[in-house]
């Protein structure tokens, strides 16, 4: 069995970066994709020889098709890239705003997964983790219904993938709650709403990364599941 090689989208910062760091500490190789070149290069440099980085926009099917997945063939995938969108009632959203959310949060993971399946190394048991959200289960906070809808679609996609790709691949989703990352800045909740979280605080990217590591490398009989990392909040 070869060393695991994990493709991570949205890997330049936040949860994606924390997952990459955790996996490198386990001895895995990581393929880092993001649209932010400077941050991506910095993350790659910090992770060292077990990391390769490439600027890839998962909303662009041609960019995905052109990405290098042959130098290091991936065995595992983390569909982490996503956007929150602007706080606005779904009644006021333009079609273009809704389509952009769905393009990045739903279509992107589907396209990346298809490319991963065509490229993946077959000599190592593999797994996929999709980064959803508790918003996909509860509909999202006021003003973020479109985000919640996109993450709900990703949860449905996770279950379909788990069914269709078994027994060769395990597929699970993570559903974080309020996590201290740049994307969550200005999002509903945060430290000011800590009283709404049973554990009394927001989570960290590292705590989500720990759950991702477990699903990827240490959960051989777990598939088709949604693991909440939300401090008890639903």
Enumerate the predicted regions with their spans.
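Active-site loop-to-helix junction immediately N-terminal to the catalytic Tyr of the SDR YXXXK motif
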Residues: 93, 139-148, 160
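Residue(s) in the substrate-gating loop at a strand-loop-helix junction
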Residues: 133
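C-terminal substrate-recognition "lid" of short-chain dehydrogenase/reductases
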Residues: 204-229
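Short, small/polar-rich loop/turn modules that mediate ligand/substrate recognition or access, typified
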Residues: 125, 166-170, 222-224
């Amino acid at each position: 069995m070869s060393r695991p090689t994990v493709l991570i989208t949205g890997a330049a910062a936040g949860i994606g970066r924390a997952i990459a760091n955790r996996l490198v500490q386990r001895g895995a190789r990581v393929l880092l994709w993001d649209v932010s070149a400077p941050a991506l290069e910095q993350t790659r440099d910090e992770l060292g020889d077990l990391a390769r980085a490439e600027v890839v926009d998962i909303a662009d099917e041609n960019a995905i098709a052109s990405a290098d997945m042959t130098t290091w063939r991936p065995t595992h995938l983390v569909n982490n890239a996503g956007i929150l969108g602007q706080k606005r009632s779904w009644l006021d959203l333009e079609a273009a705003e809704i389509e952009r959310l769905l393009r990045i949060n739903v279509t992107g993971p589907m396209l990346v997964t298809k490319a991963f399946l065509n490229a993946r190394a077959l000599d190592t048991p593999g797994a996929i983790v999709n980064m959803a959200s508790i918003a996909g289960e509860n509909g999202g906070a006021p003003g973020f219904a479109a985000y919640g809808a996109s993450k709900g679609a990703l949860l449905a996609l996770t279950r379909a993938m788990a069914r269709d790709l078994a027994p060769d691949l395990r597929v699970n989703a993570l559903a974080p709650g309020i996590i201290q990352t740049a994307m969550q800045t200005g999002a509903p909740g945060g430290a000011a709403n800590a009283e709404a979280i049973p554990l009394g605080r927001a989570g960290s990217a590292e705590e989500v990364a720990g759950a991702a590591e477990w699903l990827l490398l240490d959960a051989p009989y777990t598939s088709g599941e949604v693991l909440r990392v939300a401090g008890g909040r639903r």
